[in-house]
Amino acid sequence: MTAPFFQTSGNLLADRRYTFGQELAERGDAAGAADLFAQAVELAPAFVSAWFALGETRARLDEKSVAIDAFRKVLALDPADRHGAGLHLMRLQAKGLGGMPPDYVRSLFDQYAARFDTALVEGLAYRGPELLRVSVEAACAAAGRRASFRMALDLGCGTGLGGAAIRPLAGRLIGVDLSPKMVEQAKAKKLYDRLVVENLVTFLKLQSDAVFDLVFAADVFAYFADLAPLAVACARVLEPGGLLAFSVETHAGDGVILGEKLRFAHARTHVRAAIAAAGLRLLTLDDAVTRNDGNMPVPGLIAVAARD
């Protein structure tokens, strides 16, 4: 159990108890870990990382009310929510579903950037960009057009895994991501004509109408609860005939759920409704497994939609 963001307490004894608690948690001793985290926050009451870890372990022990109190303490001490405590409150049904804190997403991916490709491709058998590209090519073939794009946007480009998949299809390729360290990794691959570090919704709002003929988002929409506002923002920057292609995780029920891994899963009906709200025409909505988790396939969907 490792928090995506760690900030020392400034108290050596508290930091040591936190470290020992992490070791116990990783060995599966949640009760022992919780005791150490409780000692850490007693020594350093403003120790945000220890409060967060305490919330995680109490949740694992099914001590819901204590976990909720710990996560609320995290938010009080760090309103930017770099640890993602608000997401845990959503999971514990102590807070309604909403957007992910940008500072949490940034710190999470800054932490993983250097090992991201290996962890995702080798560890989780990630193949989202390739499957998404195949769907784009198939949609173009069905429409009797070439899979060739004047100006493509890789939304949430990360380290450039998506860029590698669509670079052969794009005259110009723009990448945008919230994480500076992920963008550094993408820059080293020399796939993009331009890379931008920015909040994705903010970036879309700053663009003129109808500037892209492809918006490509592999493994990005899993970080948004309601897809409709994002789909609307993407539709505005698409030129007539342009395509929006994205992948999501899905589930058999209705609406949106927040999974154990703190990623949103969207029902097929929610995806259809979001595309309709954006005024786009759905071309493809196929079942797909873009990644594994614990050697088990994660159910997903691949969507391709067009602006008429």
Whereabouts are the PLM-identified features?
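Class I SAM-dependent methyltransferase SAM/SAH-binding core
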Residues: 151-153, 158-204
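A short acidic, Gly/Pro-enriched loop at the edge of an enzyme's catalytic core
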Residues: 205-215
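A short glycine-rich, Lys/Arg-flanked "PGG" loop and its adjoining helix->strand segment in the class I
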Residues: 228-240
